[in-house]
Amino acid sequence: MKNGKIGVTTENIFPVIKKFLYSDHEIFLRELISNAVDATQKLKTLSSIGEMKGELGDLTIHVAVDKEAKTLTVTDRGVGMTAEEVDKYINQIAFSGAEEFMEKYKNQSIIGHFGLGFYSSFMVADKVEIFTKSYKKEAKTVHWSCTGTPEFEMEETDAEHDRGTTIVLHLSEDSLEYAESSKVEELL
């Protein structure tokens, strides 16, 4: 188990993100789906150049809502992340993992950047959890959670999780419409 603080330049970054950075509250879903598409594209790229061994399998991105649990979940079977990558790309706000990847694989088309966009989730969620497992051999599942403060919890676990990333948004009381299938379908 690792506890730590998310690296930010100001203690008040989350209220800024929640209230001012994104005037369109529905951007969070586009950002999460864009990140899932990026992760899937990266996996395809790595597979095509022989750096990822094994079957790609079903690369469909899934969005699910649970009205009772008040959650919205986005799941992909892309590259996933190791604990070190979560530390680097999630815990250091605004650093984009896509930049490094694009530099290494310049000729490939990669959209979006995993950075601040992920944090738009806190506009609608009181708590965000990530369950992720890298495509890399011997990778462990990483569980990360944050309640919208600069503090997070992260641990590697032996829990079964397919390659890829699942992001669970525990919706805030004023955003429960995103636990409605009809609302999410409208946005997609």
Give the predicted meaning of each segment.
Residues M1-Y178, E186:
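GHKL (Bergerat-fold) ATPase N-terminal catalytic module, capturing the glycine-rich phosphate-binding loop
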